[in-house]
Every structure is written in C-alpha cells, then in structure tokens.
C-alpha cells in the first residue's frame, strides 16, 4: 500500500460527536461487543458483494472465496478485522463513517436510558455499530477499496474519536475493508488469540462465511511457516441450512441477535423446511422488545431473503403482512430466480403462496408461545399487541386466528391488565348469553366504573374493557368470534336478549310508556344537543348516561380522525335516564321550567364527563351546578 495522498481533515456530524463521547466514556460494561459489531458489518459487506456480483461477476475480481479475518499484534497493541467484501470508495467512507444518513444517531441518543448494559444493546439496532470500535481503541484506521474500482482508488480513513477524522487516497490492491484498532491503555487483553477466539465463538459462530484467525505456533521458531496459516474459528455454515436437532438454543439466540441487531434474546422462534411443490426454508423469530420505530411508516421491516443460500436483500416485506412487521428472520427459496427484484416480488403465485404459509407459521408460533409460556406472551403483547390489532382489517382469512391471540382488560380481572383472551371470555359466558360485550374508553381507570356497566354487574356478566386508541377501529372489522357477535354496550338501544326475562322486557316497556312525557320535556330542554331521549335499561345506580347512536362514531374514532386532520361527521348522543333514580324523580316533579332546564343540562354534562368526553361549555356547567348547590343549602 502506498503513502496517503490527497489528504483531508473533516469534522464529524454533531450527533456522531455525541455518540463518540458515549462510546469512549460510558459504554464500558460490555466492551467485547465491538468485535460482534465489526464482524457483523463485515458479513453484511460480503452479502452485498455476492448480491451485486450476480449482475456484475467481474466485481469478484477472480476471487469468489469470501471470508473475514481477525488478527492481532501484541507488541503493537492492535486488533485487525479484514474482509474481502464490497468495500468502500472515498465518498462511501466519508458519508458512512462521518455521518449517519438516516438520523440513526439522533434516535439512538434519544433512546438512551443511562443503564450501560441496555444502552450497549441499542448500538446495533440503530445502525451505529462501527463506532463501538472506540470503546476499546483510541485510534481507528480503516483501509478500504470498493469492488470494481482500480487499486489506486483505495481510501484510508483515520480518527482518534475526537470530533474530526482524516481521509486520504491510497493504493489498495485487494478489494474490501481492513479496520485496525489501536487499543487504549488497559485494553491489551483483546490483543490475545484465545480472548478473540472466545468472543467470536460466543457471538459469531452462526455467521455464514469463514471467520479466520492465524494458527497459533507453539513449536521452535525455525519450524514456524514463512507465511501465516489461517483457520476458520466458526462453523461457517448458514444456520438455517442445518438440521434443527443439531442446533442449540444458544445458537438460535445468537443468530437472532445478528440479523435483528438486538442484544436481547428472542421470545420464540420457528425453523421449518418446506419440500414439495414449493421448496424453501424459513427461520422466524419473535423479538423480546419492540424497536423504537415500530409504528413509523418507513421503519425497517421484512425478512432477509436468500435464494439458494445467496443473499438477495434485506427487508423483503412481501413475505409477511404489515401487522406482523415485528417478526424477524430469514427465508431461503429454491423457487425464486437469483436476479429477483423488489418489483418481481410484488406479486405472483410463488410469493403469494410463501406469504400465506409464513403468515400461518408466525401465528402458530404466537399461539404456541401463548399456550406454553403465558408470561413471555404477556411481554409480547405489551410490546406488539397494537400492531397485531391491525390484523383483522388487513387479513380477513386469518381474522379468527388473530382474534384468538388478542388480550384485553375486562371486568373479570380487577388489576386492569390486558390478560383476557377471547377464548377465556367465551368459556365464562353466562347462561343464555349469545353476545360478546365490550366497552371502549381512554383508560381502564376511566371506564372500569362506567355507568354503562351497571346492568352487567347486576346480572354478573363479564364485559371486555378496550382502552387502546385503535380499539374502536379494530371492532369495526372484528365483528364476531366463535360464531358470536360483539356488542358495544355504549351503542344503540341495548338488547340483552335471553338475559332479560319476558317479564323484565314487559316491565321495561311499561316504564318507558309511563315516562314518555318526561322524555319529551328533557328533549325540549336539551334541544339540539341530543338526538333522542329515552328510558335506560342499562342503569341501576346512576341517573343518566349518553349512548352512542347505532351508526355514529364513538369518542375514540372521533379523536383519531381529528388527530389526523380529517373531517369528523357530526353526531349527537342519545340521552338515557334511570326512571327510579331520586334525581330523575325530582326532575320529573319539577314544575319551574328554568330549574328543570338547569337540572337537565347538569345531568347531561355529568353523563358526558362519565363517558370521557369534554364539555362544550364547562363554565356554564359550573355556574348551573353552583346555582343548584346554593338552592340546596338554603
């Protein structure tokens, strides 16, 4: 390699400076991750070269044997990671090593918790793994040449992690990237063959290409070979191609960490080989925690796609529906061509068939997790439940299966935890109950004592309590389960069917008829604020509630539409009153029209508050309430 030419000194992006400070001063509790990250990057570089060489075989430059080499020099106190992958041009080195184009650094810094171990785990997830080199090194030199460029267009990038880096042109005959870490004082333990082999075995045994180290020579100096001999220190076979019976749980876990850039273990995995009309192998994982960008429109999602063990692309989104975007893994097909593109993957019988099978496989994996490890499934639900709730709208064919995986709060569990599955709910149905009842609201605390639940408590009927913002939208698609319809207890004229006896229904009709005059007076007092006034069959303790019209939007959907800037159709609630409540009896007896109107409006406003709605005229409510309280105190 020749002397550096055309040397420049450039400054790091502001966020990268912050990141470097973090690496240098804070993340020292798990230093060995630097090797995991740099080897993982080298493996990605090899994958990219394989893919580009499908179209341009000349990029292999006569050498298709891809490998990663890890070496060390005790005297010089250096560790070197060398690959013959795709390599970098000068422009690549400046843009990839001096800035983070996708704002990954800013997001990384935003998610730091101050817990060293947790923060170290975030490094790979946010695509900033290269900078982990500065955990153990006070200077990092990178020598690289992109495949296809002439030897004279190599690049030397160098930095001490202090806000600036140098970049220069060098001659580099061989393609790929060599990273030289100059170890800090006190980090000499990493300039040791056994230490490095141990770390590679721990983190990188699953990497699908050879990771080589120099053979240790323990004999006489005269017997030492003139050229160093290299030996693979990992299995160097794609994990998913091996028989399941030969793979340990720890190997699956390390492979997941490699492909997901996550230092935590997965909650579950499913490894399957399909033979017959279609031939492919899949290895799918359920992560233990949600990525920071799970709900971002442009977040990374999809599986790693291989064709006959040749890497084709990351984030192949076409093999799983959007509601399963949290699933990580690989799919290796024998039925797709090596020159497959994202456009080709958009449709076609092979892709459609694989998507259908992989979707079912993912849902089966979640069912097994829920059955065998309910505590782990509770963790999954906390992290990914809202994404799964998108399923019934997107995947009609699997709607029942998805519904069975959902968990909700209910009146059966007073902790408020989302722990109740629909199958459990159905198993507890009251005698004669043929409907599944639910109530939506902003929070468990807000709806657990809702007046809408009073008649259900009286009859001992369980009601699901749905408090995620997406729930009302979800229930517009999830209309039944196990052959039974869902009923919103706050919507329309509640009909309990067989849960009410014929005598009960007859008595309700008689009461409603006897209170028609009161209903008309209240409607006149409330005017355009309500669509209708009627006697309630829902209430046992409260004086009044607001019911949602059968075809109207509920509060959650109105808020969702407003938040997204969409027009919200106008709707008016139905005012229902409890004819046996003392306040309603007092209202019925009130002859003073002003007092009647004030009391009616106060009852309406209280019902709105109980439903979680805001008041149009809070000052008017307070004024009327104070007036009534003052009259009572006289």
From Swiss-Prot:
Q: In its keyword annotation, does this UniProt entry include tRNA processing?
A: no
Q: Which UniProt keywords apply?
A: ATP-binding, Chaperone, Cytoplasm, Nucleotide-binding, Stress response
| A Pfam family of this chain | HATPase_c_3
Entry superkingdom: Bacteria
The places in or outside the cell where this protein is found are: Cytoplasm
Region A, annotated ranges: 1-342
Region C, residue ranges: 560-634
Q: Region labeled B — which residues?
A: 343-559
| Major location (coarse) | cytoplasm
GO CC terms of this entry: cytoplasm
PROSITE patterns, sorted: HSP90
* Single Gene Ontology MF annotation: ATP hydrolysis activity
**Which NCBIfam families does the record match to this protein?**
PRK05218.1 (NF003555)
Describe the protein's quaternary organization and the partners it interacts with.
Homodimer.
Query: What this chain does, per the record?
Result: Molecular chaperone. Has ATPase activity.
Q: Which family does it belong to?
A: Belongs to the heat shock protein 90 family.
**Listed name of the protein:** Chaperone protein HtpG
From the broadest rank down, the organism's phylogenetic lineage runs: Bacteria, Pseudomonadati, Pseudomonadota, Gammaproteobacteria, Lysobacterales
What would be the name of the gene that encodes this protein? htpG
């Amino acid at each position: 390699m020749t002397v550096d030419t055309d040397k420049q000194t450039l400054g790091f992006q502001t966020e990268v400076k912050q990141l470097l400070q973090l690496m240098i001063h804070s993340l020292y509790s798990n230093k060995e991750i630097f090797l995991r990250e740099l080897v993982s990057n080298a493996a990605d570089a090899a994958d990219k070269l394989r893919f580009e060489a499908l179209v341009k075989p000349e990029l292999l430059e006569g050498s298709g044997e891809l490998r990663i080499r890890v070496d060390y020099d005790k005297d010089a106190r250096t560790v070197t990671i060398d690959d013959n992958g795709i390599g970098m041009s000068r422009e690549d080195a400046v843009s990839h090593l001096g800035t983070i184009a996708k704002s990954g650094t800013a997001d990384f810094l935003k998610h730091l918790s101050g817990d060293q171990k947790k923060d170290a785990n975030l490094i790979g997830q946010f695509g900033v793994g290269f900078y982990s080199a500065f955990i153990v090194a006070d200077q990092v030199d990178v020598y690289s040449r992109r495949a296809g460029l002439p030897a004279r267009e190599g690049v030397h990038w160098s930095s001490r992690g202090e806000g600036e880096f140098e970049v220069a042109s060098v001659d580099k005959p061989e393609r790929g990237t060599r990273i030289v870490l100059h170890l800090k004082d006190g980090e000499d333990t990493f300039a040791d063959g056994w230490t490095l082999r141990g770390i590679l075995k721990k983190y990188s045994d699953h990497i699908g290409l050879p990771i080589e180290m120099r053979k240790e020579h323990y004999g006489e100096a005269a017997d030492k070979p003139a050229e160093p001999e290299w030996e693979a220190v990992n299995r160097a076979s794609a994990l998913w191609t091996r028989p399941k019976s030969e793979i340990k749980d720890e190997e699956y876990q390390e492979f997941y960490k490699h492909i997901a850039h996550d230092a935590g273990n997965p909650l579950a995995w499913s490894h399957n080989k399909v033979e017959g009309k279609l031939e492919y192998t899949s290895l799918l994982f359920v992560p233990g925690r949600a990525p920071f960008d799970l709900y971002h429109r442009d977040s990374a999602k999809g599986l790693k796609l291989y064709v006959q063990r040749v890497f084709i692309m990351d984030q192949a989104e076409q093999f799983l529906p959007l509601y399963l975007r949290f699933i990580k893994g690989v799919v290796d097909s024998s039925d797709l061509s090596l020159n497959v593109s994202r456009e080709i993957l958009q449709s076609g019988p092979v892709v459609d068939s694989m998507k259908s099978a992989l979707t079912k496989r993912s849902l089966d994996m979640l069912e097994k997790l829920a059955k065998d490890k309910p505590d782990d499934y509770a963790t999954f639900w906390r992290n990914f439940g809202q994404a799964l709730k998108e399923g019934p709208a997107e995947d009609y064919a699997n709607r029942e299966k998805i519904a069975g995986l959902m968990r909700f709060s209910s009146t059966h569990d007073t902790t408020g935890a989302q722990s109740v599955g629909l199958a459990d709910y159905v198993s507890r149905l009251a005698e004669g109950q043929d409907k599944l009842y639910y109530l939506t609201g902003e929070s468990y605390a807000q709806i657990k004592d809702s007046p809408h639940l009073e008649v259900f408590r009286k009859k001992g009927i369980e009601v699901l309590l749905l408090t995620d913002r997406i729930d009302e939208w979800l229930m517009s698609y999830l209309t039944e389960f196990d052959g039974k319809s869902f009923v919103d207890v706050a919507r329309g004229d509640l009909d309990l069917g067989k849960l009410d006896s014929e005598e009960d229904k007859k008595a309700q009709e008689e009461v409603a008829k006897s209170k028609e005059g009161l209903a008309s007076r209240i409607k006149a007092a409330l005017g355009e604020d309500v669509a209708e006034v009627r006697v309630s069959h829902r209430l046992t303790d409260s004086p009044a509630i607001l019911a949602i019209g059968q075809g109207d939007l509920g509060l959650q959907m109105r808020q969702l539409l407003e938040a997204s800037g969409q027009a919200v159709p106008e709707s008016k609630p139905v005012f229902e009153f409890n004819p046996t409540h003392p306040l309603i009896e007092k209202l019925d007896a009130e002859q003073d029209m002003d007092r009647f109107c004030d009391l009616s409006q106060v009852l309406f406003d209280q019902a709105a508050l109980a439903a979680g709605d805001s008041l149009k005229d809070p000052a008017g409510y307070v004024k009327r309430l104070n007036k009534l309280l003052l009259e009572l105190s006289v």
